[in-house]
């Protein structure tokens, strides 16, 4: 009994297949996406000059013409790491065309020399296979990057996109960073 697709589609799949029978379960997660204009633009998952616990960071950029308040937004991955952006001040603002660095540590003498706009806790970047998922205050996905081995980063080298308006979900959109900063990492 087929309740998932129309009989016409089931018949077409049946007729097209040389490996009968064909059974398939398809489901879609209840995910809401939001076009807020904030893009993940650079990721330092594996710092070389300091430990991961001090030197991990990622960068976002506001591609809109409006200032956006990040208060109440969240970062997470699929392994359960999650952090809600919060400030004792009323807002966490990112101006139009502004780049904004989120990191585990803002002490430049400990984090490899990167200038940080916001410090997070409870969230880590794997050195080989992970996700950076950015959600707005309502829980809608604003942007996400799923990276793995083969993406253009290595120990001490972040990966970046050169154009924040291209699809940053594609490996071909990312490049190894070539600018040295702080203690010698590239980012």
Place the predicted regions along the sequence by residue:
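Activation on beta-sandwich/Ig-like modules and their edge loops
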Residues: 29-171, 183-184
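Metal-dependent phosphoester-hydrolase catalytic domains
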Residues: 1-32, 132, 144-147
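Surface beta-loop-beta hairpin patches that serve as ligand-binding interfaces in beta-rich domains
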Residues: 11-27, 170-187
